[in-house]
């Protein structure tokens, strides 16, 4: 299964980007052994519309353009379902085994994600009940993707 990340906002050069890239590289190297591969990271500039609803809608249009036809969609949202690392790994395995070829994980902008995306999503997850800066969400999901692969492959990185 090809997994892509979609993010509203660009990750500027610096330690946050370096760490996210490090975990995505690890995922890209180890994922194929368990049938998961990194397809791409798609970034878009945040909408500059006057109100939040319009910004969310404009950002949703960009996300829809980035989606491959028939792909699964997972949204990261502070009101989503919290999973531990093993449950996240199992969710990825379930998606992989579903016969779908593509999965997109979406990180919304400062205003969140459009309700139409929530209605279309295959899962809405949170990385805890706290609100996280965009840069840290990228690092956290990159690390969790790598951790999921190590869980699925039996690698000792994850020691629960």
UniProtKB/Swiss-Prot annotation:
What EC number(s) does its UniProt record assign? 2.1.1.177
Does the entry feature the keyword S-adenosyl-L-methionine, yes or no? yes
Source organism of this protein record? Sinorhizobium medicae (strain WSM419) (Ensifer medicae)
The record's subunit annotation is: Homodimer.
- GO MF term (any one): rRNA (pseudouridine-N3-)-methyltransferase activity
Q: Which gene encodes it?
A: rlmH
Question: Where in the cell does this protein reside?
Answer: Cytoplasm
Q: What highest taxon heads this organism's lineage? A: Bacteria
Keywords (A to Z) from UniProt: Cytoplasm, Methyltransferase, rRNA processing, S-adenosyl-L-methionine, Transferase
Residues that bind S-adenosyl-L-methionine, according to the entry?
76, 108, 127-132
Q: Which InterPro entries match?
A: Alpha/beta_knot_MTases, RlmH-like, tRNA_m1G_MTases_N
| Name the record gives this protein | Ribosomal RNA large subunit methyltransferase H
